[in-house]
Amino acid sequence: MTNRTTLLPEQKEQTRHGGCLFPFQKYITVLSDLCPSVTPHWHDEAELTLIKRGRCTYQIRFETCEAEQGDLLFVPPAALHSLMIPSKSRYESETYVFHMSFLGANTADICAVRYLAPVAAQSLLLPCHIRKGHPAHPELMEIFNSINSVYENAAPGYELILKSLLLRTIAVLLPYGKEESSRPQLQTEHMDKLKLVLEYISEHYAEELSIAQLAKLCFFSEYHFMRFFKKYMG
């Protein structure tokens, strides 16, 4: 059986998702009143998640969705995302985190240039929330279950099968994708600023930080920064 890693929300940024030659890793996330949320974060890899139990509020790229058991979520590379569960509830999910380079996003062929590289760069946006009623849901559930089986058994050549299943995932979502230009420019700028602030806090967490320092990073007044930060971070 392949090793699985339990995802601790506060440690996710430091987690190495698989290895250099096989950048693929499974995580099981469990949330409850003791740990009711995964704080906003991002990483270079994409995610495919199945909610196994409970419901939650997901925020991906500043878009909020209410997800529940049986729903699937696709988080593109470098997308800011977070989730929170209702009080007095329990949430469980299975997530596969993978780098788009594993699928060939860095190669020079038509699949990479037309599809994989744009998805990796977020210039082509695939749907993030695939509800049980979504047309792509049945096929994606079949794919997810196959990924589970192949990953757990880890038979010779299983990496090739996983790669093909992830490519199929992208292919199934492609008809429902849209160009990045459909996203408001202001939202893009806010996302970039928030990622910059979170990265700065992560790098200087041991130091005494002031609102003035963080506001300066965004070229905001302290008042504007406080409103901006509260809006997206709560």
Task: Please identify what each model-predicted range represents.
Residues 2-26, 80-149:
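A hydrophobic/aromatic-rich effector-binding and dimerization subdomain
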Residues 20, 59-63:
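Short strand-coil-strand connectors
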Residues 41-43, 81, 224:
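Histidine-centered divalent metal-coordination motifs
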Residues 41-58, 74:
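Short, conserved beta-strand element in jelly-roll/cupin
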Residues 62-77:
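Short acidic-glycine-tyrosine-enriched beta hairpin
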Residues 121-122, 129-185, 189-192, 196:
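An amphipathic alpha-helical interaction segment
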Residues 171-179, 196-234:
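Basic/polar phosphate-binding segments, predominantly the helix-turn-helix DNA-binding elements
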